[in-house]
Amino acid sequence: MTDLSFSPRPLSPGGRREPPLRPEYERTVTATGPIGDVARPLSPWERLSNVTALRRLLVLAAVAGLWQAAAVWQNNPLMFPTFTDTAAALWDGIRHDGLLSMAWTSLSVLLKGYAVALVLAVLLTTVAVSTRIGNDLLSTLTSMFNPLPAIALLPIAMLWFGLGEVSLIFVLVHAVLWPLALNTHAGFTSVSETLRMAGRNYGLGGLRYVVTLLIPAAFPAILTGLKVGWAFAWRTLIAAELVFGVSSGKGGLGWFIFQNRNELYIDKVFAGLVTVILIGLLVENVVFRWIEVHTVRKWGMVR
């Protein structure tokens, strides 16, 4: 057994006693073997459950199964077509009814309105963050217009711009601008003073301070605003096309849904709705997911 007792040291020339010396010793590390679940190999089911894409596909499959069962139980195709009938109508719409071209028509208008709203949101947020009057301006405008449904502006859009693409872009900008600007401004104002002071201590200033510190710190809220704005844009676009009928002289997804409802092709109505859902899933899980992985997840800001 190692003696760990301390030996006193003699007095120093100044009359002070030096601290005691502890004898050196070594401890031998013994292997303990596997510890709990650390060394246990994962089962095939556990490995599959760790795949995010597979879990989401299982959720979609469960929804499709419940849809099919509920439609078969109701047995009324005019009210609720089955999933298989809707899938067949979707394929038929792609092959013969130009569903993809209609989807692209709607998507192109949506992207234009979304881009205009994004530019305006950046300008408004920049003014709001920089000046007090800008902050009051953004706060007042969002309080006024954010609760106002975009669909309520349809009569004004029809009166000012007529039936066409400009009217659709007008209501899209209204639908996207306010939630996007509100989330972006909230992201910048939520950056802590400690983080701001740390950036200044590192010599950051001007545009470098904004790009290097403020935007990354506020980006989770900005990304949330982009997602919310995208969802609002789709809702507004489909509702507007149901009223306008066409955009730029061509029918969009809203027109496809409206026309088939009038002709009682309910399976094609559901096919149009499924197309909107599929585009939304694609954008959410590809575009926004890519942005999230290469920004906030890479920076360790979200799990």
Feature annotation, model-predicted:
Residues 1-61, 285-303:
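Transmembrane alpha-helical segments of polytopic membrane transport and secretion proteins
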Residues 41-49, 72-116, 255:
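Periplasmic/extracellular loop-to-transmembrane helix junction in inner-membrane transport proteins
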Residues 112-142:
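Transmembrane-helix boundary motif in ABC transporter permease subunits
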Residues 132, 189, 266, 270-303:
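C-terminal transmembrane helix and the adjacent membrane-cytosol boundary/short C-terminal tail
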Residues 143-179, 186-187:
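Generic hydrophobic transmembrane alpha-helix motif, especially the helices
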Residues 159, 237-266, 270, 275, ...:
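Glycine-rich helix-loop "coupling/hinge" segments at transmembrane-helix boundaries
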Residues 170, 174, 207-240, 271, ...:
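Transmembrane alpha-helices
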Residues 183-225:
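Short cytoplasmic-facing helical segments at TM-TM junctions of multi-pass membrane proteins
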